[in-house]
């Protein structure tokens, strides 16, 4: 859904906190950071509720698309876990808010265990304090969340990961293979979503137009399809694991300025992403019939925007979606593999 005339902040710095689904960490050169005292937690409770849905739907889709991503060596083993600590926040008001609203301390704490992902299936939940990864102590305070990212990601690539909670109880999470593209929820009233070959992003403005997970899966599936199809391969090198969690936070809340990127796709690319995105939806177990009503509603909402240069017209898009839905349903009825009928690439 990227608009050639609209910019969308989708750099990995938009992550709210340390996330085991993306060990790559933005370097100082890629983020224009706000002053260290900028406040970031206003409205955080509602944002985290929204993000939980985005992470859940994104994880399912990325798992469903893993066979396609494996062909380009773009998969990884993930736990579906986001952590944070007070050490990631420098503003006194933020720290007080997080202590009161989330009982956050300087210990490595689960901010979000993605529903139906390995960590949550192992029994982890928001608020759990983590002390060890495979027996290696995490410590607390500065650097602890970064240490967790590095240890847990390294462990996940070789098998089950043992995570020890405060009190000594250890759970074992079996990593799941997914496409390596993290899913970002960007705080912006703009109605947009994007993919740049490295990440998927949706704005809160577009998120709030969705009525259920099926509609959210339609959007994220479309963006994921852009990446799996290689419509826009990232030209920038991926960063090595590291720190800067405060930059993640500031960028997401909007008090820092990350790079804005314009990612135009051709009309043919958009049609292909619509088509393949529906297949990813179906393979992930979502209701593809939600597509028609949502696109009608979205088209009505955004028809004043100048997107026709890079997007199919509303009626053309709906007609193509209807055809794809019929095709997928026929394959489901015949118990055939849900593989899109793509033309060979030149």
Describe the predicted segments one by one.
Residues 41-108, 174, 185, 189:
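PDZ/PDZ-like peptide-tail recognition elements
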Residues 94-113, 129-131, 182-213:
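Active-site scaffold of zinc-dependent metalloenzymes
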């Amino acid at each position: 859904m990227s608009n050639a005339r609209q910019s969308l902040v989708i750099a990995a710095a938009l992550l709210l906190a340390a996330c085991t689904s993306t060990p790559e960490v933005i370097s100082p050169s890629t983020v224009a950071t706000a002053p260290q005292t900028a406040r970031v937690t206003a409205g955080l409770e509602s944002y985290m509720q929204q993000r939980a849905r985005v992470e859940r739907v994104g994880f399912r889709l990325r798992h469903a698309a893993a066979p396609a991503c494996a062909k380009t060596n773009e998969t990884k083993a993930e736990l579906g876990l986001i952590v944070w600590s007070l050490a990631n926040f420098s503003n006194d008001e933020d720290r007080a808010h997080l202590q009161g609203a989330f009982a956050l301390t300087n210990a490595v704490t689960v901010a979000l265990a993605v529903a139906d992902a390995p960590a949550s299936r192992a029994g982890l939940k928001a608020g759990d304090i983590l002390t060890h990864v495979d027996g290696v102590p995490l410590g607390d305070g500065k650097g602890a969340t970064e240490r967790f990212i590095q240890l847990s990601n390294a462990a996940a690539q070789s098998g089950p990961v043992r995570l020890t909670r405060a009190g000594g109880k250890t759970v074992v999470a079996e990593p799941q293979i997914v496409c390596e593209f993290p899913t970002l929820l960007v705080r912006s009233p703009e109605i947009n979503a994007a993919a740049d070959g490295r990440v998927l992003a949706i704005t809160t403005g577009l998120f709030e137009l969705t009525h259920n997970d099926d509609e959210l899966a339609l959007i994220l599936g479309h963006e994921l399809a852009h990446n799996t199809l290689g419509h826009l391969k990232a030209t920038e090198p991926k960063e090595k694991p590291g720190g800067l969690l405060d930059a993640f936070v500031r960028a997401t809340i909007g008090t820092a300025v990350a790079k804005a990127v314009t990612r135009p796709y051709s009309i043919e690319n958009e049609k292909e992403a619509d088509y393949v995105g529906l297949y990813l939806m179906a393979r992930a177990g979502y209701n593809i019939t939600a597509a028609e009503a949502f696109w009608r509603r979205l088209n009505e909402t955004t028809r004043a925007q100048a997107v026709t240069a890079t997007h199919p017209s509303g009626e053309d898009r709906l007609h193509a979606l209807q055809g794809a839905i019929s095709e997928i349903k026929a394959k489901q009825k015949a118990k055939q593999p849900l593989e899109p009928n793509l033309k060979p690439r030149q």
